[in-house]
Amino acid sequence: LYMVNRQIVNKPMVAKQLSIFLENKSGRLTEVTEVLAKEGVNLSALCIAENADFGILRGIVSEPDKAYKALKDNHFAVNVTDVVGISCPNIPGSLAKVLRFLSDEGVFIEYMYSFANGETANVIIRPNDMDNCIRVLTEKKVDLLAASELYKL
């Protein structure tokens, strides 16, 4: 349950995202996916950011706690971060409208990534202020994805 405007919202909208730090060398991404596969954990959404020395894989997995433990046990540097997922129509301007709602209320997007499936676009957002972000999205009737929905994508 999550509190928005002092009311309990019945679907937990904050999801756990894994951030895995990878050396820039051949095979490291393969190793991550093999560890997850061995544990039966599905990697359903991801993005990779990199610099000269390392990359960061940010991903949504089917079982975050299990994945975290497996990756730690295999000597990966991994963190868990709270994110929120939304679903919007996969048409021009749809995301711009949602981002305008947030920026007008002072919510800064630290990063985001998305994936589309037919007529629907799903967006993972890491805001600077989770409570305010969820409040704004709820008030504007944006379709928030429950964590359990994200883990099944």
Protein language model features and the residues they cover:
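A conserved regulatory-domain signal marking ACT and ACT-like small-molecule sensing domains
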Residues: 4-153
